[in-house]
């Protein structure tokens, strides 16, 4: 349908800007066969010059929208000049989400202003815009894996001097997504200094997958609260909805747990590099206003060390040679045989439940447990022999399960409900015996092995729900130099946005795709911190966002022109997103190919 409207689009734009001269303009753009072609402007021509972004908005099926809508996406044929100071948002149904709706409305206006390049000043002439928000469930503001994120967006002229935009949704989250889409329908005519808006719009949209996330490891290196909020801001711009906070590990314990203060006092990298309850609440609220749940992970029983030194509840901490006991230094695992450990866990979980109070799920970690580490402890060996267990792989799985069941009970108690729990793939989750240990109704399994791992099919056939984080496409720390020794890191090479985009959960899961809740890009932080965060994540995470929102049947080539634009939009937001191509390619579509 889009190809048939290209001539109409050009006519529509001409009608709106016909009276404006462009004598000083050197270049103009024209839509030709789905590409915006750069042409030398002729001031004597009766055809006014068309700006690049105005051309891109209509020269392909989804305009400049990211992620692409999954339902109807009719962008009409016309752009209207808009007065930036005459945009009003009106909430038609009041309820418990009023504060969130008002915050979203304020942010929407800020997002609209992103269409204006730094240093440009739009003319304050043009039509007024009235945005009407119709939330059918204005009292519902809880995250859930079943929440309705759908929305409908209608834009149409209203008389000679106004444009009406109406967003309808069944939740605040859908409403927020609709505002995000609407903000992307504004472009700046840098030839005439006018803010423009698509005048006739009909969009129906909803995500394919309910879980669309980014994991950030803030234990191996510290990230400022400002950088975390900046990440969530960018996530909201591309409709990602879960910030998975891997907040502790063996290298540091920066989470301020008031019930066990020695953990962070002894475990933080410095007294300043901690996450207080007030700071976490700020992040959680920031995420809620942007439709992003903040999901805590307390990784156990492995990946513990710093902070636990004086508890007598760990084994093999800083053991040497480390390669014999863990996958990276320092080693450390909890001792499941210590009864006192489980009160510690309940206290940590309770402190997390208090501050991460919007989460509907909880991540318990559970990867890379070393049998050799546990087997190095006399007390653990004695416990296993008392229980008539051997010291073999199967018996250590029993010990691990002993820990997991007790930790599970403490998590339910701390959160005050039986919430879904997430575990990483591991020897405990092996499909050959997982149902001996983990109930498929209680646990979601997050896959970090490759996308062709036979474990995926085995887990799906047994009815388990999965989140895909296969490292061969979604580990954003891959492709850098080794941090122990020389050479490249373990999961090299670097993963480009194209591979991220083409990593389809539906293709991986096939007939079991309904059991896949979504996916998540992971940034493990051995070699990243606040100063490198943006470039590691963006714009690659935007590729993940469209894959999980739309699950397109097409590949990255069809999305490239929009991908280049969303990168530019992120930069305008203050995100230091990595450059994908020379800017020349953005201005000359179709020339930069292999």
UniProtKB/Swiss-Prot annotation:
- Give disulfide pairs as residue numbers: 31-59, 36-55, 316-373, 326-331, 478-491, 585-592
Record note on disruption phenotype: RNA interference of this gene does not cause any visible changes in phenotype in larvae before pupation. At the pupation stage, 20% of the larvae show abnormal phenotypes. They fail to shed their old cuticles completely before starting to form new ones underneath.
- Glycosylation site residues: 164, 375
Q: Catalytic residues?
A: 249 (charge relay system), 303 (charge relay system), 368 (charge relay system)
> What's the catalysed reaction?
Hydrolysis of terminal non-reducing N-acetyl-D-hexosamine residues in N-acetyl-beta-D-hexosaminides
UniProt cross-references to SUPFAM superfamilies, sorted A to Z: (Trans)glycosidases, beta-N-acetylhexosaminidase-like domain
GO BP terms: namely: chitin catabolic process; glycosaminoglycan metabolic process; polysaccharide catabolic process
Under InterPro entries, the record lists: Beta_hexosaminidase_sua/sub, Glyco_hydro_20_cat, Glycoside_hydrolase_SF, Hex-like_dom2, HEX_eukaryotic_N
The protein's pH behavior is summarized as: Optimum pH is around 7.0.
Which residues does this entry assign to the site Important determinant of glycosidic bond specificity?
Answer: 327
Q: Which Pfam families match?
A: Glyco_hydro_20 (PF00728), Glycohydro_20b2 (PF14845)
Q: Where is this site: Essential for chitooligosaccharide substrate binding?
A: 328, 490
Effect on the protein of changing residue 490 to A: 2,277-fold increase in Ki for TMG-chitotriomycin inhibitor. 13-fold increase in KM for GlcNAc-beta-1,4-GlcNAc. KM similar to that of wild-type, but 62% decrease in catalytic activity with 4MU-beta-GlcNAc as substrate
Which UniProt key words apply to this protein? Carbohydrate metabolism, Chitin degradation, Disulfide bond, Glycoprotein, Glycosidase, Hydrolase, Polysaccharide degradation, Signal
Q: State the activity regulation.
A: Inhibited by O-(2-acetamido-2-deoxy-D-glucopyransylidene)-amino-N-phenylcarbamate (PUGNAc). Inhibited by thiabendazole (TMG)-chitotriomycin. Inhibited by 6-(dimethylamino)-2-(2-(((5-methyl-1,3,4-thiadiazol-2-yl)methyl)amino)ethyl)- 1H-benzo[de]isoquinoline-1,3(2H)-dione (Q2), a synthesized non-carbohydrate unsymmetrical dyad of naphthalimide and thiadiazole having a dimethylamino group at C4 of the naphthalimide.
Query: What is said about its interaction partners and assembly?
Result: Homodimer.
As for what it does, the entry says: Hydrolyzes one beta-GlcNAc unit at a time from the non-reducing ends of substrates, with a preference for shorter substrates. The 2-acetamido group and the beta-glycoside bond linkage in the substrate are required for its activity. Active with p-nitrophenyl (pNP)-beta-GlcNAc, pNP-beta-GalNAc and chitooligosaccharides (degree of polymerization from 2 to 6), but not with the complex N-glycan substrate (GlcNAcbeta-1,2Manalpha-1,6)(GlcNAcbeta-1,2Manalpha-1,3)Manbeta-1,4GlcNAcbeta-1,4GlcNAc-PA (GnGn-PA), pNP-alpha-GlcNAc or with the long polymer colloidal chitin. Involved in chitin catabolism.
The family note in this entry says:
Belongs to the glycosyl hydrolase 20 family.
Q: Name it.
A: Chitooligosaccharidolytic beta-N-acetylglucosaminidase
Organism per entry: Ostrinia furnacalis
């Amino acid at each position: 349908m889009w190809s048939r409207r290209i001539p109409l689009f050009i006519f529509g734009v001409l009608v709106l800007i016909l009276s404006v001269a462009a004598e000083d303009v050197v270049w103009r753009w024209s839509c030709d066969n789905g590409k915006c072609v750069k042409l030398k402007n002729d001031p004597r021509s009766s055809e006014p010059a068309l700006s690049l972004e105005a051309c891109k908005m209509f020269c392909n099926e989804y305009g400049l929208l990211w992620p692409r809508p999954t339902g109807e996406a009719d962008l009409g044929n016309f752009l209207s000049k808009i007065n930036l100071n005459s945009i009003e948002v009106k909430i038609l149904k009041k309820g418990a989400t009023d504060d969130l709706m008002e915050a979203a409305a304020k942010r929407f206006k800020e997002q609209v202003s992103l269409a204006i390049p730094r240093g440009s000043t739009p003319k304050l002439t043009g039509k007024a815009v009235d945005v009407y928000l119709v939330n059918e469930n204005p009292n519902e503001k809880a995250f859930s894996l079943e929440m309705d994120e759908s929305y409908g967006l209608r834009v149409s002229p209203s008389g000679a001097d106004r444009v009406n935009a109406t967003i309808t949704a069944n939740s605040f989250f859908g409403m927020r997504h609709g505002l995000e889409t609407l903000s992307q329908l504004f472009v700046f005519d840098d030839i005439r200094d006018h803010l423009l808006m698509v005048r006739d719009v009909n969009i129906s949209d909803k995500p394919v997958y309910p879980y669309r996330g980014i994991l950030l490891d803030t234990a191996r290196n510290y990230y400022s609260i400002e950088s975390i909020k900046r990440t969530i801001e960018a996530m909201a711009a591309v409709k990602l909805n879960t910030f998975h906070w891997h907040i502790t590990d063996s290298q540091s314990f920066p989470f301020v747990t008031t019930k066990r203060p020695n953990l962070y006092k002894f475990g933080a990298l410095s007294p300043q590099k901690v996450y207080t309850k007030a700071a976490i609440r700020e992040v959680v609220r920031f995420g809620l206003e942007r439709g992003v749940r903040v999901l805590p992970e307390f990784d156990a029983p492995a990946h513990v060390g710093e902070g636990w030194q004086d508890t007598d509840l760990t084994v093999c901490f800083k053991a040497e040679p480390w390669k014999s006991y863990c996958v990276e230094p320092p080693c450390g695992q909890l001792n499941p045989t210590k009864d006192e450990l489980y009160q510690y866990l309940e206290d940590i979980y309770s402190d997390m439940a208090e501050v991460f109070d919007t989460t509907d799920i909880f991540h318990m970690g559970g990867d890379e447990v070393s049998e050799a580490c546990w087997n190095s402890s006399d007390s653990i060996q004695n416990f296993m022999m008392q229980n008539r267990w051997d010291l073999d792989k199967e018996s250590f799985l029993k010990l691990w399960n002993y820990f997991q069941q007790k930790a599970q009970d403490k998590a339910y108690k701390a959160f005050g409900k039986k919430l879904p729990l997430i575990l990483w793939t591991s020897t405990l989750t092996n499909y050959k015996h997982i149902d001996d240990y983990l109930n498929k109704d209680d646990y979601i399994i997050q896959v970090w092995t490759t996308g062709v791992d036979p474990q995926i099919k085995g887990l799906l056939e047994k009815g388990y729900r999965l989140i895909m984080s296969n490292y061969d496409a979604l580990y954003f720390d891959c492709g850098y130099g080794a941090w122990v020794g020389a050479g490249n890191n373990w999961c090299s090479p670097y993963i480009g946005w194209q591979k991220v985009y083409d990593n389809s959960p539906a293709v991986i899961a096939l007939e079991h795709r309904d059991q896949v809740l979504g996916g998540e890009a992971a940034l493990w932080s051995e070699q990243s911190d606040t100063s490198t965060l943006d470039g590691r994540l963006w714009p690659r995470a935007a590729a993940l966002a469209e894959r999980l929102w739309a699950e397109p049947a097409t590949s990255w080539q069809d999305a490239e022109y929009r991908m280049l634009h969303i990168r530019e939009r992120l930069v305008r937001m203050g995100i230091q997103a990595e450059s994908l191509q020379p800017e020349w390619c953005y201005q000359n579509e179709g020339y930069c190919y292999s």
